[in-house]
Regions:
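A juxtamembrane structural motif centered on a specific transmembrane helix
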Residues: 1, 31, 317-363
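Extracytosolic (periplasmic/ER-lumenal) interhelical loops and adjacent juxtamembrane/interface segments
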Residues: 221-244
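Alpha-helical transmembrane segments of integral membrane proteins, especially early/N-terminal helices
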Residues: 6-11, 69-77, 231-238
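Long extracytoplasmic/lumenal interhelical loops at the membrane interface
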Residues: 237-273, 293
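Transmembrane helix boundary and interhelical junction motifs in multipass membrane proteins
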Residues: 154-159, 241-246, 257-259, 276, ...
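Hydrophobic alpha-helical transmembrane segments of multi-pass inner membrane proteins, especially
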Residues: 16-225, 264-325, 349, 353
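N-terminal membrane topogenic signal
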Residues: 1-20, 64
Length: 363
């Protein structure tokens, strides 16, 4: 099977490999300009991610879905471990130390939830009607980890889980009566829900929302991240400042240059032309995921690929719009680009899942 999978990928999907290689190369190049040691560490994580992806390719996706509840349970347990014993850094408790490195279970919950919702919303691999009980169970399975992750605090990943859940519910189709009741109920309880949510947000999260509404009101405080990101993007011009030429990074004006705002760094260095190239490569990967879903006649493969497509599409859209100041800074990383080992492994593993679906669905 191993040789068959490799031959299939090289023969049928060379453009996919070129696009993926281009994005990973851009990632390392950009991180090198921020700090060479970051590029070296990210390169190691990319290699680890590729090995994990190779493992995913060897296991039929139907077998992975059959064990979805076990996968979900393991990752959910790790989230509780983070609450009790997690490593704390910069006011956030998100990591578990394993030897010389750390893992971030919240990132793995993205893939675990995709498996779990696929298994839950299907019955023995067959599509079934969305019942109130099925909806409630899926919602609880999403909200529980989302709540634990938001309390770390990691609002960005919690938002991503909610988006993945929404994608699945939309795919299942919601009766108009349920939509109407949900809208009326949502509007009626929104003021109360907003007050509860606002009361549980950390102060820096509130600051990000205030900064989104009016970043210029406090340019050295709440609006600093957004303003510096927009300056970085604007100063890139058409063709950028060149490798390691990003002044926002060189003079340390841009916080989170290697994580949330790495796309701003790349745009300042390579300009509009570089940004267009990167977005084109990402758009191709999203298109590949969407096409995988649409071409798969197996409901299991369809739902899995749709979940991956939603994860990549909204992940890169939210991050790009956040960098441009169109959305508030919620901490959603750019897939395959933001620095972080766990996020890189999950992103590469998700793409490997698409190839897995394409290969095994045709056998």
């Amino acid at each position: 099977v191993k040789n068959e999978v490799i031959a299939y990928i090289l023969k049928v999907h060379p453009l996919f490999l070129v696009a993926l290689g281009g994005v990973l190369g851009i990632d390392l190049l950009t991180l090198y300009s921020v700090a060479p040691y970051l590029a070296m560490k990210q390169g190691i994580w990319e290699i680890v991610g590729l090995f994990v992806s190779a493992g995913i390719l060897m296991i039929p996706y139907t077998l992975l879905v059959r064990n979805a509840r076990i996968i979900y349970g393991i990752v959910l347990t790790l989230l509780f471990v983070v609450v009790l014993f997690g490593h704390q850094s910069h006011g956030a408790r998100r990591w578990i130390g394993v030897g010389w490195f750390q893992i971030q279970p919240s990132e793995f919950m993205i893939l675990a939830l995709i498996f779990f919702l696929t298994a839950t919303l299907l019955h023995n691999g067959k599509d079934v009607r969305l019942t109130p009980g099925l909806f409630a169970g899926s919602a609880i399975a999403t909200l529980l980890p989302a709540f634990l992750i938001a309390r770390q605090p990691d609002l960005g990943t919690a938002v991503e889980l909610s988006i993945i859940f929404s994608v699945y519910i939309l795919l299942k189709g919601i009766p108009s009566r349920v939509v109407g009741i949900s809208l009326i109920g949502g509007l009626a309880f929104f003021p109360v829900a907003w007050e509860v949510l606002w009361a549980h947000l950390h102060e820096f999260q509130k600051d990000r929302i205030r900064a989104f509404i009016d970043p210029a009101s406090d340019p050295s405080g709440m609006g600093y991240h957004t303003i510096q990101s927009i300056v970085a993007v604007g100063s890139g011009g058409w063709f950028g400042q060149g490798l390691s030429g990003a002044t926002q990074v060189r003079y340390q004006f841009l916080p989170g240059a290697q994580t949330d705002f790495v796309f701003a760094v790349f745009t300042e260095e390579w300009g509009f032309a570089g940004a267009l190239l990167f977005l084109s490569l990402m758009a191709y990967l999203v298109w590949f995921a969407t096409r995988t879903a649409l071409e798969c006649r197996d409901p299991v493969g369809f739902y899995l690929a749709s979940g991956v497509s939603g994860f990549f599409l909204f992940g890169f859209l939210i991050n790009a719009l956040m960098v441009l100041g169109v959305l508030p800074v919620v901490g959603v990383p750019m897939p395959l680009m933001s620095y972080g080992g766990s996020a890189m492994i999950v992103s590469l593993g998700s793409l490997a899942l698409l190839l897995n679906i394409r290969f095994y669905a045709k056998r």
